[in-house]
């Protein structure tokens, strides 16, 4: 494999492509096992993603994308992220994310009182997604 100084990063969801850049110097994702930094010429990898931000670095700038689950596949200097949902920082509706956070917190309280574990798990995931969107919007 020839040495290369950049990566290509693509983020897709069931609704279509969210992000595409072929001049990336570093990709940072949070997997179920922890944070993973990918530089050009990294060994091939496939990993399940956590609900968290994805950071895409190029030259002196960094793009931040809220990713809610999925996986990353990297080989031959191309990273493809297939996510359940993903939003660019500039596309996040903060008021909507704050509202979703409040709804999830209320649902968690109700589920705890009712001892409804399945509803509790769903609400906890919704809360993590809302917090992720809020955090990414602040970058």
Curated annotation (Swiss-Prot):
Transmembrane segments: none annotated. GO terms for molecular function: ATP binding; proton-transporting ATP synthase activity, rotational mechanism. It is found in: Cell membrane. The keyword Chaperone does not apply. Gene3D superfamilies: ATP synthase delta/epsilon subunit, C-terminal domain, F0F1 ATP synthase delta/epsilon subunit, N-terminal. Its main location: membrane. Belongs to the ATPase epsilon chain family. F-type ATPases have 2 components, CF(1) - the catalytic core - and CF(0) - the membrane proton channel. CF(1) has five subunits: alpha(3), beta(3), gamma(1), delta(1), epsilon(1). CF(0) has three main subunits: a, b and c. This is ATP synthase epsilon chain. The gene is atpC.
């Amino acid at each position: 494999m020839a040495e290369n100084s950049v990566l290509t990063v693509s983020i897709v969801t069931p609704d279509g492509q969210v992000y595409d850049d072929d001049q990336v110097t570093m990709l940072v994702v949070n997997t179920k096992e922890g944070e993973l930094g990918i530089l050009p010429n990294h060994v091939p990898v496939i990993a399940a993603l956590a609900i968290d931000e994805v950071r895409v670095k190029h030259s002196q700038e960094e793009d931040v994308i809220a990713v809610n689950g999925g996986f990353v596949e990297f080989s031959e200097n191309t990273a493809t992220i297939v996510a359940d949902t993903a939003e660019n920082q500039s596309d996040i509706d903060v008021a909507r994310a704050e509202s979703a956070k409040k709804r999830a917190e209320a649902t968690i309280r109700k589920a705890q009182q009712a001892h409804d574990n399945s509803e509790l798990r769903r609400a906890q995931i919704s809360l993590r997604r809302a917090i992720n969107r809020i955090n990414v919007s602040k970058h």
